[in-house]
């Protein structure tokens, strides 16, 4: 693989083999039995698939040396966030009603949190 060292290639190939083996160990359930039994088998299969997916992510992160902690999402300060419904107010079925907007000033929209 271009631009990578041979050692890293071996780790990546080993990780791919492990992940492939994990997915092959959980075949789709057979369509036999009652509808309820089929539904239960599919539900359990999906739960196992989710577990395999998370294990596969961990295997890749371990073999490729990814970051241990995810990079946190940078959010604006809460003081600058306001809920302004003046532009879009309408019936509750419309989309976009009350979308959050940021402004330069920090009005006391929610108050201090103390009950009156």
From Swiss-Prot:
Gene3D superfamilies: 6.10.140.630. GO terms for biological process: mRNA transport; viral process. InterPro entries: REV_protein. GO terms for cellular component: host cell cytoplasm; host cell nucleolus. Homomultimer; when bound to the RRE. Multimeric assembly is essential for activity and may involve XPO1. Binds to human KPNB1, XPO1, TNPO1, RANBP5 and IPO7. Interacts with the viral Integrase. Interacts with human KHDRBS1. Interacts with human NAP1; this interaction decreases Rev multimerization and stimulates its activity. Interacts with human DEAD-box helicases DDX3 and DDX24; these interactions may serve for viral RNA export to the cytoplasm and packaging, respectively. HIV-1 lineages are divided in three main groups, M (for Major), O (for Outlier), and N (for New, or Non-M, Non-O). The vast majority of strains found worldwide belong to the group M. Group O seems to be endemic to and largely confined to Cameroon and neighboring countries in West Central Africa, where these viruses represent a small minority of HIV-1 strains. The group N is represented by a limited number of isolates from Cameroonian persons. The group M is further subdivided in 9 clades or subtypes (A to D, F to H, J and K). A motif (Nuclear localization signal and RNA-binding (RRE)) lies at residues 34-50. Residues 27-49, 86-116 are annotated as: Disordered. Its main location: host cell. Pfam families: REV. It is found in: Host nucleus, Host nucleolus; Host cytoplasm. Asymmetrically arginine dimethylated at one site by host PRMT6. Methylation impairs the RNA-binding activity and export of viral RNA from the nucleus to the cytoplasm. Keywords: AIDS, Host cytoplasm, Host nucleus, Host-virus interaction, Methylation, mRNA transport, Phosphoprotein, RNA-binding, Transport. This is Protein Rev. A motif (Nuclear export signal and binding to XPO1) lies at residues 73-84. GO terms for molecular function: DNA-binding transcription factor activity; RNA binding. HAMAP family: REV_HIV1. The keyword Cell wall biogenesis/degradation does not apply. Residues 18-26 are annotated as: Homomultimerization. The modification Phosphoserine is found at residues 5, 92, 99. Residues 38-49 have a biased composition (Basic residues). The RNA-binding motif binds to the RRE, a 240 bp stem-and-loop structure present in incompletely spliced viral pre-mRNAs. This region also contains the NLS which mediates nuclear localization via KPNB1 binding and, when the N-terminal sequence is present, nucleolar targeting. These overlapping functions prevent Rev bound to RRE from undesirable return to the nucleus. When Rev binds the RRE, the NLS becomes masked while the NES remains accessible. The leucine-rich NES mediates binding to human XPO1. Belongs to the HIV-1 REV protein family. Escorts unspliced or incompletely spliced viral pre-mRNAs (late transcripts) out of the nucleus of infected cells. These pre-mRNAs carry a recognition sequence called Rev responsive element (RRE) located in the env gene, that is not present in fully spliced viral mRNAs (early transcripts). This function is essential since most viral proteins are translated from unspliced or partially spliced pre-mRNAs which cannot exit the nucleus by the pathway used by fully processed cellular mRNAs. Rev itself is translated from a fully spliced mRNA that readily exits the nucleus. The lineage of its organism: Viruses, Riboviria, Pararnavirae, Artverviricota, Revtraviricetes.
């Amino acid at each position: 693989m271009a631009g990578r060292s041979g050692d890293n290639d071996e780790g990546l190939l080993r990780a791919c083999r492990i992940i492939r083996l994990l997915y092959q160990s959980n075949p789709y359930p057979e369509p036999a039995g009652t509808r309820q039994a089929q539904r239960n088998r599919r539900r359990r299969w999906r739960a196992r698939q989710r577990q395999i997916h998370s294990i596969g992510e961990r295997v890749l992160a371990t073999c490729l040396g990814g970051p241990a902690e995810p990079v946190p999402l940078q959010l604006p300060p809460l003081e600058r966030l306001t809920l302004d419904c003046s532009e879009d107010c309408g019936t509750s079925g419309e989309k976009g009603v009350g979308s959050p907007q940021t402004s330069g000033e920090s009005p006391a929209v929610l108050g201090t949190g103390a009950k009156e």
